[in-house]
Amino acid sequence: VTVYGIVDTGVAKQTGKDTYMTHNYESSLGFRGTEDLGNGYKAMFQLEHRLNLNDGTVYGGNPDIDWYGGANVGIGTPFGTFRLGRVDELPTETLRTLDPFNQDSIASMTLSTQRSTHIDNTIRYDSPNLSGLQIGATYSLGKNTKGSDRDNAFARAGADNDGYAGSVLYDNGTVTLLGNWSRLADSNKSYIWNLGGAYAWGPLRLSLAYEKTHDKGWYNAERSLSENSGVADSSLINGVA
């Protein structure tokens, strides 16, 4: 079993506002373990808690999610890895490889309205690394629409749906190429797709990504940003050097 984590905090001051505590990366404490089953198979698990260091509250604003950073079990095989539970979302995880700030600070690439860092009730598959090429896929079960959400508004609107995603990533150390397509569960079948790449010359790395969002007004059983902003479709281009 491996115990891991990060503790990050700082003090910031903005003109016209009081001095306050903040962070560049969220603090976390996690537990990760594997058990060799022989013949190329292994069992695995992950539990990761996220917290706000300044007051000890749960990171993410939802006190009902104790293991915000991940809660899953899985099995590794010669044919790939299978995990079940709360896992990292493929489009966010892969696109982060193009961002030196890991999409987690003021200079990071902006998340779209239909991308999430983690997704629940999910079966995830990751292929073996084949000379730099990896393929991933997820299938997410929608929520139980019989009383598990606030007033069942999304169910009555017909916005409840299962979710799935596919990802292709190639990285040989110098060249990185990737593509994703994703539909979140309980999003009224909203979806995003993105393409990106990077090239490294010694210590210099240039990256570019394009993302297209089709937001139908729901985001994981909650009304999305497009409900209030009037923006249902958006495109995003990011470049980082």
Predicted regions, residues:
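Outer membrane beta-barrel
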Residues: V1-K13, K17-N144, L169-T176
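Extracellular loop and loop/strand-boundary signature of outer-membrane beta-barrel proteins
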Residues: T15-D18, M109-T110, G147-F154, L225-V231
